[in-house]
């Protein structure tokens, strides 16, 4: 049975959670009146969702979207900061928004059709893949306010873009649009605005159709490639293969191929 995080179906919920097609979690930021700015309620909700999706064997991919027609997220709620409640915008385990530093194995896909700025951009950078429209925009304007992008943006952006482009964005506070982000490889799939969520869910479905253990271990090694030396990565790869080979799905793939049928993945 799919685990549903508590409190996300209340009328005043700031983050919505639903399961699509049995294997994809759709997470929707829903503070349109505040341009989906992150407050304590958002941070707690996202951390709860990370915990629930990681614990649920049915969930194989997560899509992070927005209910606002023009904004993905404006980042930190400055009213909360001005009121002395900055600490509430992060959680001990997940960091800013309960997500950017969260330990997780399952892939997250950001569906962006609008502005993803400051902490909103850092939410996108915390995801594994991005589906966006040409009118989407990504930026770290913190220096305009005497701040820095301390929720991962300053080191994740240079990994996601050519370093000189990232440095320009950080130093000038100027954003780039979805088309340019796609050209640089930051955006995986560029589609018309009305198809962003649909395409993100389709990408999630493609991932969910593969062997869950193999996807998890493959992504674990691929993510580690950004931080580890080659020798450590080899060990990481060997460990991942051992885990995949010990799973029930390891033999199911070849059997399904030989029997000319779709594989029946168990995730075990």
Model features per residue range: what roles?
Residues 1-69, 83:
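Conserved CoA-thioester-binding segment of acyl-CoA-metabolizing enzymes
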Residues 1-26, 30, 174-208, 216-226, ...:
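Amphipathic alpha-helical segments at domain termini/boundaries
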Residues 69-73, 117-118, 139, 222:
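Short, active-site-adjacent cap segments at secondary-structure transitions
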Residues 99-213, 238, 242, 246-247, ...:
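Crotonase-fold acyl-CoA enzyme core
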Residues 228-233:
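Short beta-strand->loop
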Residues 45-47, 51, 78-116, 145, ...:
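An acidic, glycine-rich surface segment that forms the CoA-thioester-binding/catalytic face
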